[in-house]
Amino acid sequence: MQLKIQLLMLVLMTVLTDVYSKDGFIVSKKNCLYRCSQSDERGFCNAVCLRYDADSGYCRTGKCWCDGLPQKANIAMKNKSYC
């Protein structure tokens, strides 16, 4: 019985984490994307993303991509242009 409860809690925590976080290219307060170099092995982008309360970040196609951002975070939309 104890094992079943622990497994249920694990599943619920996983589902809730996915629901309450999002991933994407982070947009600054000035409505700009953070540019980066592909050779930046998680350094700059990870630091930027952590400032926005993300789990981690890395350089993807020359822009900072953040994983595990809070729902309130401003991420880039496909049909919008940024500075």
Swiss-Prot record:
Its main location: secreted. Transmembrane segments: none annotated. Residues 22-83 form the LCN-type CS-alpha/beta domain. InterPro entries: LCN-type_CS_alpha_beta_dom (IPR044062), Scorpion_toxin-like (IPR003614), Scorpion_toxin-like_sf (IPR036574), Scorpion_toxinL (IPR018218), Scorpion_toxinL/defensin (IPR002061). Residues 1-21 form the signal peptide. The keyword Secreted applies. The keyword Signal applies. Expressed by the venom gland. GO terms for molecular function: sodium channel inhibitor activity; toxin activity. Keywords: Disulfide bond, Ion channel impairing toxin, Neurotoxin, Secreted, Signal, Toxin, Voltage-gated sodium channel impairing toxin. One of its GO terms (cellular component) is extracellular region. GO terms for biological process: defense response. It is found in: Secreted. Disulfide bonds join 32-83, 36-59, 45-64, 49-66. PROSITE patterns: LCN_CSAB. Belongs to the long (4 C-C) scorpion toxin superfamily. Sodium channel inhibitor family. Alpha subfamily. Has the structural arrangement of an alpha-helix connected to antiparallel beta-sheets by disulfide bonds (CS-alpha/beta). Binds voltage-independently at site-3 of voltage-gated sodium channels (Nav) and inhibits the inactivation of the activated channels, thereby blocking neuronal transmission. This is Neurotoxin LmNaTx35.1. The lineage of its organism: Eukaryota, Metazoa, Ecdysozoa, Arthropoda, Chelicerata.
